[in-house]
Amino acid sequence: MQLILLSSLLLLGLSLANGHETDPEGQILNSLVETVGRLEKKIDKVENAFLTVHRARSFGSGSERLYVTNKQVGNFEAVRNTCVQAGGHIPSPQLLNENKAFASVLERHNKAAYLVVQNSAKFTNWAAGEPNNADGNKLCVKADAQGAWHSASCDEDLLVVCEFSFI
């Protein structure tokens, strides 16, 4: 579709460059209008399909955020880089239902994963005795397989889970 649009634009450009000030019969312009119309319809279909899939994936959790793993493990920086490259970020659940959706991924894989806790967070899910950085080297936060939060070393290799917000 992009090739057709580019070809039409090229033809229009060549026509104008060869001294044709207009498209006398409107063929090139009409072709461009039709192509743009078809592209708009396809974009609408893709958007609707995407939203349908997103709603279906988030239906059980009630969360507008999607939590996905590639089943790899890594330290905090590696997880952050992986998530950024994928267009997401390290999970930062803001609500109970978001933490449940995040925890469901961890429970399926029976592993812990990093998360980011905002300073202004209204929701937290700290395990008993947490946060605890008594030894001074637990500068990160991880969620266990049940979704409870713990202080953690940023060097631990944990499950890569990324959060994607689409809406």
UniProtKB/Swiss-Prot annotation:
Disulfide bonds join C83-C162, C140-C154. It is found in: Secreted. Pfam families: Lectin_C. Expressed by the liver. Keywords: Disulfide bond, Lectin, Secreted, Signal. PROSITE patterns: C_TYPE_LECTIN_1 (PS00615), C_TYPE_LECTIN_2 (PS50041). InterPro entries: C-type_lectin-like, C-type_lectin-like/link_sf, C-type_lectin_CS, CTDL_fold. Residues 1-19 form the signal peptide. Its main location: secreted. Residues 62-163 form the C-type lectin domain. One of its GO terms (cellular component) is extracellular region. GO terms for molecular function: carbohydrate binding. Does not show any inhibitory activity against various snake venom PLA2s. Does not inhibit the endogenous PLA2 activities in various tissue homogenates prepared from this snake. Homotrimer; non-covalently linked. Belongs to the alpha-type phospholipase A2 inhibitor family. This is Phospholipase A2 inhibitor alpha-like protein.
